Amino acid sequence: VRATVVGVLAGLVRWVGLAFALVLVIHVLLTVGRANPDNGITVFFADAAQPLALAFRSLFTPENGDLRVLVNFGLAALFWLIGSAVLARLIRRLG
């Protein structure tokens, strides 16, 4: 039973990290792709991505807004992917 719970928990951590990274990547694609900023989908992903970007949101401040979104939100996506993988591995190892 314990192994099952550990496996499910580790899998859940990975899926959450993947979902967070996906939201950030979609926001980057919509921004760099010049999606209509008033569209509901664009607004949804922009709003959802802001808290997920954590401190990466303003880590780099290049003049070009697209580059700023690409670098900062891209780094945040990498953080969630790597962080969730490390945490899932730790859960499995300690479990």
How would you label these PLM feature ranges?
Residues 3, 7-13:
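N-terminal intrinsically disordered, cationic/polar leader segments
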Residues 62-77:
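Individual transmembrane alpha-helix segments
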Residues 33-37, 87-95:
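Membrane-interfacial segments
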Residues 25-29, 56-57, 83, 87-91:
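Alpha-helical membrane-inserting segments
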